[in-house]
């Protein structure tokens, strides 16, 4: 796993402070939780990650108990454009650290308490931005002009989700 740069560590610590303060305000932290979350190591994912925005990594102690190793965030979340969404992703991962491992109804109810609804809804936009940044090809529908950014050629094997027309491969450098 990549190690965060000193600048990334500084940004992660700033995010931690923001998220922990908000969790205190929301009344989500029991006694000892603040200290526990404050000591969870923070890191970054590989820079080529497009689907994963954050992850809580666990290890077993040999007795069936789990211990948090690290909470990793996508390094592209640490840019100014995505700061609000980065705080939400860290909040999401902290809910996992507090014992809510599944994305069940209880987890979603806790997650919905994050005060910035706009930030929490930016996940699809972040994934799309990362896919665009990494795309070498666009699969383009000649009928409806829908575009699908991809890293590999489709070679005529895929159809448009909208109109079921075979998609054409267009190099990213040819896309305006």
Predicted regions and their residues:
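Active-site-proximal or metal-binding-adjacent scaffold patches in catalytic folds
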Residues: 1-88, 97-176
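Walker B catalytic acidic pair
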Residues: 93
């Amino acid at each position: 796993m990549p190690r965060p740069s000193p600048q990334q560590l500084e940004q992660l610590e700033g995010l931690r402070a923001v998220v922990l303060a908000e969790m205190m305000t929301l009344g989500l932290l029991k006694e000892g939780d603040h200290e526990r979350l404050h000591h969870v190591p923070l890191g970054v994912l590989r820079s080529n990650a497009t689907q994963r925005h954050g992850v809580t990594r666990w290890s077993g102690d040999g007795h069936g108990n789990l211990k948090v190793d690290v909470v990793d965030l996508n390094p592209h979340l640490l840019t100014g454009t995505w700061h609000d969404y980065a705080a939400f992703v860290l909040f999401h991962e902290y809910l996992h650290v507090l014992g809510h491992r599944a994305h069940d109804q209880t987890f979603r109810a806790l997650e919905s308490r994050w005060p910035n609804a706009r930030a929490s809804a930016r996940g699809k936009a972040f994934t799309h931005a990362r896919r665009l940044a990494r795309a070498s090809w666009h699969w383009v529908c000649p009928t409806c002009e829908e575009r699908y950014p991809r890293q590999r050629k489709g070679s005529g094997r895929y159809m448009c989700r909208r109109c079921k027309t075979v998609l054409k491969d267009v190099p990213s450098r040819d896309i305006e």
